[in-house]
Amino acid sequence: MNYRGAQNLIKRGDEQGLRTALEGNLSSNTSNHKGWSLLMLAAVEGSVPVGRLLIEKGADLAAMNLKGETALSIATQKGHTAFVELLQEV
């Protein structure tokens, strides 16, 4: 699975589909050409279950996109308090 496929799973909140992809050939640290990681996409959506899964599978919490944003800064900007709390628990 590629970034675009994972992006669609995250937008739909398909935790099981993403789990299957991560158990296959998808890395939890996959990113696009702008540096957007899968965890950042989950932060945009505010999806705590997806975020938790990505963290369990080794997603880099400190990864930055080309604008210098992290999953934490994105979740904070979007007002996704539960997602922010998830990231701060780790």
Where are these regions (language model features)?
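Amphipathic alpha-helical repeat scaffolds
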Residues: 3-11, 19
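Conserved ankyrin/ankyrin-like repeat signature
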Residues: 17, 49-50, 82-83
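Ankyrin repeat start-site detector
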Residues: 33-34, 66-67
